[in-house]
Every structure is written in structure tokens, then in C-alpha cells.
Amino acid sequence: MTAPWARRAACALAALALVLLFGTPAGAETDGDCLYTLIGPDGAALTQRAGRMYVGDEYIAGDDGWYRVASVDDAAQTATAEYLGRSTEDIPAFSAYAEGAKASKGDGDKLIAMYSTHSDESYLPGDGTASKWKGAGIYDVGDSLKQALEARGIKAVYSKETFLPHDADAYNRSRRTAEELLKQGPDALLDIHRDAVPAEQYETEVDGEDISKVRLFVGRNNQNAAENRAFAKQIKAAADEKYPGLIKDIFIGKGNYNQELYPHALLLEFGTHEIEKKKAMEAADYIADVLDNVLYGGSAKAEGAKGVKGGAVARGVGWAVGLAVLAAAVYALISTGGLKSAWHKLGRSVSEVTGGLFGDRKR
């Protein structure tokens, strides 16, 4: 018979394993239910976020100033940040993504996958409402990006699956779609959103055209966080060089946002609910050009992008399987009360969790 303290410890370990497997606590990925302001060391507002801020979150401003949240006042919905320096020092060289373009297989191999976790997001100017359960405006923006990519010879797959309601479990619901899209071996996996801050924060002019800025969002609680961040920073660097003002900033927040599934997974926020939808749709054309340059050198698929497919997916799957096995082991110990019985039960569980990947244990 297992001692009470052992059962409690085992339950705690099982809960931890499941949290790591299926994502951070739901509250860490609840967006749009509040408006937090980030205050810099000089007391001036740096940015706002339609969602909570947490100690440890990071922010890369449009001018590449790099900040980390040092304290949070949830009652006032404010956070204070410390200045860390310039974020440009460790940006990967542009050629790291595009130098293999000459040796690429051709246009037929270029593929970018997209979906929209917050399936109701819409634009007041254009949709007449900020939230639509059918025909949401965010899908018009995603379609614009898809068309712009395809115009450049890049195949784009945009899932129209919906994951309503817009709540803390939306990312859990969209995870299956993200996993299905990854089976096609895309060079990037993009979650298309819009923000919910005042419109003036996203208004910009690029090449004489009034369009919306785009925020890049990285989840910092996953094993691919460093690569997700590097990908976001490279996109910003390329955009800043060719289309200054297009990328608003990069927010690195608590949560995983399904980005643990792939190093080139990224969340993009096209404008805000108060900005004209047309401006967000027009921004998509510029983003498509930036993605083409970063991933394919503007003309062909980069070796760096190609190489990330198999290995990255395998690492992500292996990480998930390992955690699933850990959860199964703890559960077996709890339910059987002994190591010997638990071992036999674990063998059966591993086979079930992995789909027979490691074979069935003989009973």
C-alpha cells in the first residue's frame, strides 16, 4: 500500500507532467480580457497589451530597445520594466536563412501553414463588430496573407477551423489543427490574430501607403522559445531594413501558444479591433514579402528553413512523448500502489501513448 505522502507527491508530479505536455496554466494564455500598460525605467509608457503581463515577460520595442518586466501591479493593470540594452546584438545573420537558396529544390517546396486560434476576432471598421462567431474579419486578413504568399510562388495552407469560444482553452483546442498542419512539413507555422489596443498604436505608413503595423508574439514557456524568438527577431530585422515601421514590436510573454511544436512557429497580430480591416489586409502583402526574403532569400527556399523540418518536428514529438510517458509512469504508480505492478501497467500505457512506436510489452 502506498503511503499518503507518496500518493500526494505522485499526483503533483503527474499534474506537472500534464501541464508541461499540454501547455502552461490556462490563465497564462488568456488574451483580450484586460489592458495592461508597460512602464519603462523613465516612467513613460512603452506599450500596451490586451492581456496580462507577468514578471519575466520581455519586450523588444520598434527601435530595438530590449526590456524585461520586473514587477506587476494587477490592480492597476500596469507593469514596470528594466532596460536590458539593444536587442540587435544577437540577431542571426540574414544569410543563415537564405544562403541555401541557390541549392534549393524550387518553388514547389515552399510551404507556409496558417490558422487563427481566436476565431472570432474582427475589426469594428469593416466588420461592424469586434467579435463575430461566423465570418470573422481575421479570416479576411489570413486570406490576404495567403494570396500574397501564393503570388510569390509560395504555397500557403490556411485552416479555416474555428476554436470558439475566445477563452483560455482556445489554444488547447487549436493545438490539434497546428499538429495536423505540421504534418505537411511547412517552413513556418503562423497563428493569425489582431490586437485589442487603441488604433493609434498600430497606424503607420509604409511606402506611402497607410497600413497597419504588425506585432510579433513569442511564448517564452516552451523548449523552442529561443528559436521562436530568433525567428521573430530575424523577421523584424528584415522588415525594418526594407519596410521601416511595418513591425510594431515583439512581445515575449508567459505561455507557449502552441509554439513548442515548431521552431518557426509564430503569432502575428495584424492591427487592432479599432483599426480599418483594409489596413490590416494591406499589411499582409508586406509581411508576405518579408517572409519570402527571410525564409527563401526572396526567390528560393533556404537550406536553413528546409533543415528545420524533420529534426524540429522530431524533437517536438519526442519531447511530448517523453512527458506523456512520465505522466503514465506516475499514474501507474498511483493506481497500483507498487513498483512491480506499476512497471507492468506502464508497459501497456507506453504502447497506448506512443501508438505502438516502441512495441507492445509482453504480458
Segments predicted by a language model, with ranges:
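Bacterial N-terminal signal peptides
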Residues: 12-21
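Catalytic-core regions of hydrolytic enzymes
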Residues: 125-201
